[in-house]
């Protein structure tokens, strides 16, 4: 799937096949979830599938003009016999939106606090946040946008530095064993994306494996060890998230809920705290 996201590695026949194969896996997962939850298929009204993004085209001015997600909805519908809704991102872009992040409406429905603002932070490949007003606030609107790289640069660096022996920093061990290069970190935080006002979205097209490999080379030129490089890129994710809160939060959140793979990285979580 990751190769399908990289120009020069992706092939149209692979993308075509993945579109159906991913749907088979998603259908099996949906059926397993229904069973574990104690429901029958006929009791489920619908399945919503946003698919697997392989390309999200963001222009220099921040406008999103195209996007492509895999996971064939027809396969999901056939395998589960449940009405399936898809193409959420494409519809949002067609209506003039950014196509991401998509979780903000579900966050709004399920995760508002009775009395204070709450931040819901995903740290997947890319980080995104939803700022939610409290239930007691009937006036304020939520805000959601991509904060920048989540795990993507860390994973790319670890993969490159270990020759593929590791594809992510398990338990944050490399970051915890390294030293953050504060001067380099400060320069990395000057990327124009971080200053751009929401609504905004980004992806592997900007913060991707190619950038990760280049940053490894930059770190090596600075005389940094592999652990120092990973520590600094981990700090980049943490600081870009914290800076986004300081700059753009409609109100100071009383708490943050963190999910995604980054939430299982002790080094990253410690930096965020």
Task: Pin down the residues of each PLM region.
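Short helix-loop-beta connector
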Residues: 40-43, 114-116, 225, 249-254
């Amino acid at each position: 799937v990751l190769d399908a996201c990289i120009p020069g590695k992706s092939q149209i026949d692979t993308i075509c096949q993945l579109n159906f194969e991913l749907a088979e896996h998603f259908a099996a997962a949906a059926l397993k979830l229904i069973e574990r939850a104690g429901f029958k298929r006929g009791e489920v009204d619908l399945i919503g599938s946003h698919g697997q993004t392989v390309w999200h085209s963001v222009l220099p001015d921040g406008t999103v003009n195209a996007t492509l997600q895999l996971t064939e909805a027809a396969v999901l519908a056939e395998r589960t016999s449940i009405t399936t809704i898809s193409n959420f991102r494409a519809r949002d872009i067609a209506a003039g939106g950014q196509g991401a992040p998509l979780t903000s409406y579900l966050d709004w429905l399920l995760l508002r606090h009775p009395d204070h603002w709450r931040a819901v932070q995903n740290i997947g490949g890319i980080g995104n946040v939803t700022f939610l007003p409290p239930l007691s606030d009937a006036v304020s609107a939520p805000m959601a946008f991509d904060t920048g790289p989540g795990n993507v640069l860390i994973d790319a660096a670890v993969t490159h530095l270990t020759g593929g022996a590791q594809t992510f920093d398990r338990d944050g061990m490399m970051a915890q064993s390294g030293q953050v290069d504060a001067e380099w970190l400060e320069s990395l935080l000057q990327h124009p994306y971080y200053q751009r006002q929401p609504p905004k979205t980004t992806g592997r097209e900007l913060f991707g494996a190619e950038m990760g490999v280049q940053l490894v080379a930059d770190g090596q030129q600075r005389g940094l060890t592999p652990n120092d490089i990973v520590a600094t890129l981990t700090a980049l994710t943490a600081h870009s998230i914290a800076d986004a809160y300081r700059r753009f939060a409609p109100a100071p959140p009383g708490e943050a809920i963190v999910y995604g793979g980054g939430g299982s990285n002790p080094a990253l979580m410690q930096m965020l705290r």
